[in-house]
Swiss-Prot record:
The chain crosses the membrane at residues 32-52, 165-185, 199-219. Disulfide bonds: none annotated. InterPro entries: HAMP_dom, HATPase_C_sf, His_kinase_dom, HisK_dim/P_dom, HisK_dim/P_sf, Light-responsive_reg, PAS, PAS-like_dom_sf. Keywords: ATP-binding, Cell membrane, Herbicide resistance, Kinase, Membrane, Nucleotide-binding, Phosphoprotein, Transferase, Transmembrane, Transmembrane helix, Two-component regulatory system. SUPFAM superfamilies: ATPase domain of HSP90 chaperone/DNA topoisomerase II/histidine kinase, HAMP domain-like, Homodimeric domain of signal transducing histidine kinase, PYP-like sensor domain (PAS domain). This is Drug sensory protein A. PANTHER family: SENSOR HISTIDINE KINASE GLRK (PTHR42878:SF7), TWO-COMPONENT HISTIDINE KINASE (PTHR42878). Residues 281-351 form the PAS domain. It is found in: Cell membrane. GO terms for cellular component: plasma membrane. Residues 220-272 form the HAMP domain. Mutations in dspA results in resistance to herbicides difunon, diuron and calmodulin antagonists chlorpromazine and trifluoperazine.
Length: 663
């Protein structure tokens, strides 16, 4: 019970609060106008209701008089018939009277005891059941002594309002009963009842409509232009120079609008010029930043990323990551974060007076406030080993007093480090290779020069052969360097028919004696239908010599070296491979190549010998092979397993009576 009472109370309080808040949002002028409109509308609606209601009451009075007159007329005519008990004539007369008078709804005759003996338009059965009919019509109790004047009343039925007229039936001073007549109300009176409501509501609404229309007209003619001007001024102040006022007004207000639009147009042109200049400068900067080979990042003083160029995204695998706005230290690899956290935080803390120099500590520099970048070299292990160089530089404002951010440039110097290491190794190898033959040559020549007369002919000849051998070794080293230089240049080589039988025979012939000395088995497996290949004989001979020489170098005594050559069948070829290919393979049962060396074995200066502790060769042989095969529009491949052996193979196009020149 308490809940049912409190809920309406709470709802009422909520509505009151809402109305109070809604009313408080209007200004004083609007409140006064609304109050005045409400008073006038209520006053006019009340006057209208009173006037129309008076008309309705007059119409009801007319209906009452009409019903009484009709009842008296009918009673005067039927009373003699009832006195004579001529009910047939009563029925005939009453029916004719009922049919000719449209306003009569029913006619009922009752005797002095109140029993109904005739009624129109009721059936005989209904009339006989006078109790039912009496209840339906609601006949009054009849008192003959006090009932000498017509009695009029109105009551409501499901079919509408009815005016009931009860007339006493008297003849020659004798009370014969009661005549009840139901009169339909005047349609004008019924309509006037609805008209009262409609006109009252219409007057109330019309007053509010006129007031609202007046307010709208006032807003459109005066208030709206002022609001538009106010909004335009706010937009101009906010930097929106595209704001225009398009209201069609003349006079002083129209002139004010025109002047405002001209001012906005001039400001927009000025802004467009500035934006165009800024956009051009920004485009230049974006182009420069996006095209430089180094990675570049800009962070604010909170170390939040503001700009990252494509190179930096690629270096740190940020291509598909929304990195702008993220914290730099949270997204760098752990190795970089460990070294840069402290320096970045010191720079971000506005160490404005510090000049950082690579390899030196901070130095005071108050005169020109220029800042040298601090350099870091960091080795990464994920996702693959590499070395990067990072440089941190402060970004100051125009007066070079306040810190605005930090620029970090990133360089992937992995290749540079590898080349430096390879060159250092190469120089070491070449120095050793050059020093040994030169020392030997010098030693033997000095011996011959000083003790030549004391040496036998055989000894002098042996010394000269050794010096000659060392000279060949020195020439071979120099030739390797020169060959690689030529291959990497744009020199043009002519390709023609190459007899692979002859090429392989000549390559193996030069190693026959060495194979015997080292107890190695040399074997060739050549297809009997081996076609001529398209290539350069001298270059391919150098390829075979280098590959077979490598197999000799890394194959132990008792091992085997096999050279195969065979045409590839059509089922092994793709449509883009051309008319046909010949495959050449050099296999050995040597020590094999470790998988981590296989990816870099064709690089310049790379030497597997470093891992097996044999400082023979220059590290250029396989690089020369790779370049020569590339000149033949092909690639060198290898398959190797440590402790099992290695197979190098490449494909050559079949010669088709054509002459090609390649560069």
């Amino acid at each position: 019970m308490g809940t049912s009472v409190s809920n309406p109370t709470a709802i009422l309080q909520t509505m009151q609060g809402f109305l109070r808040k809604w009313w408080s949002e209007f200004n004083l002028q609007t409140r006064l106008m609304a109050a005045a409109t409400l008073v006038v509308s209520l006053l006019m609606s009340g006057l209208t209701f009173w006037a129309v209601n008076t008309i309705q009451e007059d119409a009801q009075l007319v209906d009452t008089r009409f019903g009484r007159d009709v009842g008296l007329l009918l009673a005067a005519n039927v009373a003699p018939m009832i006195a004579d008990k001529n009910l047939t004539e009563v029925a005939r007369f009453s029916s004719r009277f009922y049919e000719n008078t449209s306003n009569i709804r029913y006619m009922i005759y009752a005797d002095p005891s109140g029993k109904i003996f005739f009624g129109i338009p009721y059936s005989e059965e209904t009339v006989q059941n006078s109790l039912t009919l009496e209840r339906r019509i609601e006949l009054p109790q009849i008192d003959p002594h006090n009932f000498d004047q017509p009695f009029v009343r109105q009551h409501h039925t499901p079919n509408g309002d009815v005016t009931d007229v009860f007339i006493p039936l008297q003849y020659q001073g004798k009370f014969l009963g009661v005549l009840a007549i139901g009169i339909n109300p005047n349609p004008a009176a019924v309509n006037s009842s609805n008209l009262t409501r409609d006109v009252t509501i219409a007057v109330f609404i019309s007053i509010w409509v006129m007031v609202i229309l007046g307010a709208v007209f006032n807003a459109l003619t005066i208030t709206q232009p002022i609001k538009e001007l106010l909004l335009g001024v706010k937009n101009i102040a906010a930097g929106n120079f595209k704001q225009r006022i398009t209201l069609p007004f003349g006079g002083e207000l129209g002139e004010l609008i025109v002047n405002f639009n001209e001012m906005a147009e001039r400001l927009e042109r000025y802004e467009a010029q500035n934006i165009e200049e800024l956009t051009a400068e920004k485009a230049k900067l974006d182009t420069l930043v996006s095209t430089i080979a180094d990675g570049a990042m800009l962070v604010d003083t909170n170390l939040q990323l503001l700009l990252v160029n494509p190179t930096a995204r690629r270096l740190f695998a940020w291509e598909n990551k929304p990195i702008i706005g993220e914290n730099l230290l949270e997204n760098l690899p752990p190795e970089i974060t460990a070294q840069l956290t402290q320096p970045l935080r010191e720079l971000a803390a506005d160490q404005g007076s510090l000049l950082f120099s690579p390899g030196h500590g901070p130095q005071e520099e108050e005169q020109d406030k220029t800042y040298a970048p601090e350099e870091f070299r960091i080795s990464l292990t994920q996702p693959f080993p590499r070395t990067i160089r990072l440089m941190l530089t402060q970004v100051l404002d125009q007066n070079r007093e306040n810190l605005r951010g930090i620029v970090m440039t990133v360089q992937d110097i992995t290749r540079e480090v590898e080349l430096n290491e390879a060159k250092s190794q190469f120089i070491s190898n070449v120095s050793h290779e050059l020093r040994t033959p030169l020392f030997n040559i010098k030693s033997f020549i000095e011996t011959l020069s000083e003790f030549g007369e004391d040496l036998s002919e055989v000894e002098r000849k042996e010394f000269l052969e050794t010096a000659n051998h060392e000279t060949d070794r020195l020439s071979r080293l120099v030739n390797d360097v020169l060959d690689l230089s030529k291959l990497e240049s744009s020199k043009i080589y002519q390709l023609d028919a190459v007899d692979l039988y002859q090429l392989i025979e000549q390559s193996l012939r030069s190693y026959q004696l060495n194979a015997k000395d080292k107890q190695l088995q040399l074997e060739k497996i050549l297809d009997p239908d081996l076609p001529f290949a398209l290539g350069n004989y001298d270059l391919l001979l150098q390829v075979m010599t280098n590959l077979i020489g490598n197999s000799f170098k890394f194959t132990k005594a008792g091992g085997k070296i096999i050279v195969r050559a065979y045409p590839l069948h059509r089922s092994n070829l793709r449509a883009e491979d051309g008319p046909g290919l010949v495959r050449v393979e050099i296999s050995d049962t040597g020590i094999g190549i470790d998988p981590e060396d296989q990816a870099a074995i064709f690089e310049r200066f790379y030497r597997v010998e470093n891992r097996v502790h044999t400082l023979e060769g220059t590290g250029l042989g396989l690089s020369i092979v790779k370049n020569i095969i590339a000149k033949h529009q092909s690639q060198i491949h290898l398959v190797s397993e440590v402790g099992v052996g290695t197979t190098f193979w490449f494909d050559l196009a079949v010669y088709q009576s054509m002459l090609m020149v390649v560069g």
